[in-house]
């Protein structure tokens, strides 16, 4: 009948637009295993004046669109996690110097982690959600920073740390989504996937 909304397809094929093992593990907690993984290769540089929350939302949507173009008719899930202090976006640490700078900046201070989720349904509809988590790190000694650097957990991580590793011991206080800080906020992800017709635990 004209004007009626199209029915939601039940259990469409899920494509995860990320090769992140931590996102795969988090999805498994929802009883979900993607049919395919499509890692996207995008320029993740912030736009001029872009704030951390907007950066996360934009990148998640761009990753989802890029994967959807390669997997038409599928349900596509993408995410992006950004660490910010005020209006400043902290980089993903690719070398020890960057990780060291990030940890020194976060030492003894509050910061925010924005974890955006984007879903593109088989009919091309984009749905988005954002998790915002506030954390405060203890004051880190030079020795603690160097020991963490030596462990290598920081590599490729936003803000130079992985909360699911030994850096959890740095976190004196957290308000929000622990899974969002890891890389995929489960509450928001579950809500989006269920709305898209996926059978989620």
Curated annotation (Swiss-Prot):
Alphabetized, the UniProt keywords read: Cytoplasm, Hydrolase, Nucleotide metabolism
GO molecular function term, any single one: dTTP diphosphatase activity
One GO biological process from the UniProt record? nucleotide metabolic process
User: Which positions are catalytic residues?
Assistant: 80
Site feature location: Important for substrate specificity: 22, 81, 164
Gene Ontology cellular component? cytoplasm
Q: Does the keyword Hydrolase belong to this entry?
A: yes
Specify where it is mainly localized: cytoplasm
Protein localization: Cytoplasm
Gene3D superfamilies linked to this entry: 3.90.950.10
- Give the catalysed reaction(s), semicolon-separated: dTTP + H2O = dTMP + diphosphate + H(+); UTP + H2O = UMP + diphosphate + H(+)
Q: What class of enzyme is it?
A: hydrolase
This entry's Enzyme Commission designation comes to: 3.6.1.9
Xref: CDD domains: Maf
Signal peptide segment: none
Please give the start and end residues of each transmembrane region.
Answer: none
Listed cofactors: a divalent metal cation
- Please name the HAMAP family in this protein's record: Maf (MF_00528)
Q: What function does this protein fulfil? A: Nucleoside triphosphate pyrophosphatase that hydrolyzes dTTP and UTP. May have a dual role in cell division arrest and in preventing the incorporation of modified nucleotides into cellular nucleic acids.
UniProt xrefs under PANTHER family: BIFUNCTIONAL DTTP/UTP PYROPHOSPHATASE/METHYLTRANSFERASE PROTEIN-RELATED, BIFUNCTIONAL DTTP_UTP PYROPHOSPHATASE_METHYLTRANSFERASE PROTEIN-RELATED
Q: Which family does it belong to?
A: Belongs to the Maf family. YhdE subfamily.
Give the protein's recorded name. Answer: dTTP/UTP pyrophosphatase
Q: What is the lineage of its organism?
A: Bacteria, Pseudomonadati, Pseudomonadota, Alphaproteobacteria, Sphingomonadales
């Amino acid at each position: 009948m004209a004007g009626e909304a199209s029915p939601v397809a039940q259990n469409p094929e899920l494509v995860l637009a990320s090769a992140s093992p931590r996102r795969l593990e988090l999805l498994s907690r929802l009883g979900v295993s993607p049919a395919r993984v499509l890692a996207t290769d995008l320029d993740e540089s912030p736009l001029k004046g872009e704030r951390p929350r907007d950066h996360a939302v934009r990148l998640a949507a761009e990753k989802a669109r890029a994967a959807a173009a390669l997997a038409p008719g599928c349900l596509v899930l993408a995410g992006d996690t950004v660490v910010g202090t005020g209006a400043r976006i902290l980089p993903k640490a690719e070398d020890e110097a960057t990780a060291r700078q990030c940890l020194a900046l976060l030492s003894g201070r509050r910061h925010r982690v924005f974890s955006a989720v984007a879903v593109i349904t088989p009919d091309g509809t984009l749905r988005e959600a954002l998790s915002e988590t506030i954390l405060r790190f203890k004051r880190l000694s030079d020795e603690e920073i160097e020991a963490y650097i030596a462990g290598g957990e920081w590599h490729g991580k936003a803000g130079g740390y992985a909360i699911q590793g030994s850096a959890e011991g740095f976190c004196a206080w957290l308000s929000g989504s622990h899974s969002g800080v890891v890389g995929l906020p489960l509450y928001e992800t579950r809500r989006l996937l269920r709305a898209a017709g996926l059978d989620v635990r």
